């Protein structure tokens, strides 16, 4: 699917979820994401420009293996909605994609300005002030997530903490050992 196809399909999403309906502009794919695609775009609606993000995709095959504790994109969106309703900072979910949209599983949120690359946050002096308060803020936000009403997000109950991660670690170690066996190191 090319950018024009995606923009055309986003037009229908915007028409359903922005009042008044708008037109997508400046569509560009962002870097990052191992199994999901993230796009930035602007939507002009009612004389205002809305800066938005669409994230879609996700490998349901990974969920079936139980190796990686991962949520479906729709579940991510529903978790962001539940979190923001109790005051946890989260992007505002503007739309959850539907099959008729032809964009796969995903959602559209407001764009949140900021830096996402950990290396820049750790090394760039302009983030020194943020680094001074970040651990405290992250702890407060993480603690606040415990106030989410679990019946609102029942899909979280299927994740058993640690079990999928341990399986993944064992698989990773086995793969590393297998590679080491195939590539003997010099004495």
Language-model features: locations:
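Juxta-kinase regulatory segment immediately upstream of eukaryotic protein kinase catalytic domains
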Residues: 1-21
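An amphipathic alpha-helix signature
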Residues: 7, 11, 169-177
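A conserved long alpha-helix in the C-terminal portion of kinase-like catalytic domains
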Residues: 12, 16, 78-81, 187
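Conserved N-terminal boundary motif of the eukaryotic protein kinase catalytic domain
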Residues: 21-28
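Residue-level signal for secondary-structure boundary elements
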Residues: 22, 184-185
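ATP-binding pocket architecture of kinase catalytic cores
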Residues: 28-170, 178-184
